[in-house]
Amino acid sequence: MALPQPLKPINVPQTVQQAFELQRRGKLPQAEKLYADVLSVRPDYFEALHMLAVIKLQSGDPVAALRLMIGALKARPKSPEVLFNYSLVLDALGQYDEALATLDVVLSIKRRFVEAHNNRGAILEKLGRDEEALESIDRALAVKSNHTDALYNRASVLRKLGRYEEALKSFDRVLAVKPDHVKAHNNRGTALEQLGRREDALASYERALALDPNFVEAYNNRGNTLLKLARHEEALACYERALTIEPFHAEVLNNRGNVLAELGRHRDALATCLQAAAIKPNYVNAQWNAGLLQLRLGEFAAGLKQYEWRWKREERAGTQRHYPQPLWLGEVPVAGKTILLHREQGFGDTIQFARYAPLLAKQGARVILEVQPPLKSLLATIGAGIEVIGSGEDVPSFDLHCPLMSLPLAFHTELATIPAEIPYLAAAPERIEHWSGQLPQRRALRVGLVWSGNAVHKDDHNRSIALARLKPLFDVDGIEFISLQKDVRDADAQIMADDPRITDIGRQFGDFDDTAAAVALMDLVIAVDTSVAHLAGALGKPVWVLLPFCPDWRWLTDRADNPWYPTARLFRQPGIGDWEGVVGQVRQALAARLSQNG
């Protein structure tokens, strides 16, 4: 459509100069009108086409900018400046490969074009070609060492590559050139966070917020760091401040849900995560967190479906099994079929969900159960008709397959229908005999202890206890404490060496057959949320599970029993991090048990 003619004849060069001055001063609507006036009488006038294209791009209309920039290129096809701006339009349209090719042309004409090298690096980063991006940005800095955007982009790529010390130095270089660079302060904080320097990270976020009190990302990042510092109420305040600025920010809503869950406000947390997922349906963390909350609240019908989002999580990337045979989620009968059940997460998960294997065998399926090698011998006791193999062994032919942790979904499990017939595992008699000979002669109630799990588990700080915290239990007379702890941290080993009231056999264990035999010899097992708690429950042994304030979903909320393990008794932190309160409850319960036995 033709542009409207101006009301009176215009001096084209003079009008273009006026428009350029307005554009330079940031008065884009007035400049845009003058360029349009020029193009209404001179549709091919280069300066008007080029500058109006730039304004359209700055105004968020890259489609209009593209049409105008193509017109400008027809007039000056070899102009590095026009080609560079054309690459910006292509970048804005998401046409990254075309933008990259255009920048290569620019640099073949003008080799020391700093912005072209820098933008080429930024586009390579978007394409996931991070090392090449660094090379391009470094070429920009070789031309101009204090180029702020290039320094910032370099820091951002280094951070993305996990090279946090180098990223921190680059952010510091940005701030040496431009102390009020808000994004550099914010992202410097994220690099510090990754380096474990959380108080320094908070200072960086606070500097960013002092410069821009409405910077949502800085509030969000500050909240995340405060949450890791267990400053929950302050973290919540950060997220809520961010949401007053952007009420529908999905990431902030999800993080608000996380902190509400840790504060024990599970219903509020669920509503918040569902809101985040509604705003951004492909937001994996929001969908996943909503599922965990539904499961923790006992809403299995919805939660088990949401639990399938685990496969899309970044930390699970590449772990989902894909076979030519169909995935079975309960849709077809299994009678006469061979089904492979494959492990996917930790030892405790395998022990817990292997309980479904006998149910499939009862339905007429031939069951192949793949487990971690240290569990193979123990899981072989799970029942007839089930072939147990270790990970890495040859897999017999099969018709269907299912990951172990999808079995509750396949069986449409509800709280009332959890298969909880125990014991469903058994310790080997010869191992029981062996470990019986390793224990002191029984003189009292024999209690097995496990106080810490895998040190590299992401939730280890929340679920493991230092042995020193359990020392008040040792003061209860009439109890023989046995350590079933296989991996013992140095500080805990020293306590055991110095305290004769606890006998250490756990460090001698080989596989789970040894652990199971030792558990079978106990009157009671006291354990944190680790594989031994699941093992004791599966063996039908009384087990007291010590739980953090916000535990894993399978322990549910607000109850002292557990439908997965009928012999379990749960001791929950009365407040965040309050292991002293848990130990006090357990001490009283031990005294009560002894008095009943007496």
Give residue ranges: language-model regions.
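Alpha-helical solenoid repeat scaffolds of the TPR/TPR-like class and their adjacent stem/linker regions
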Residues: 1-524, 529-598
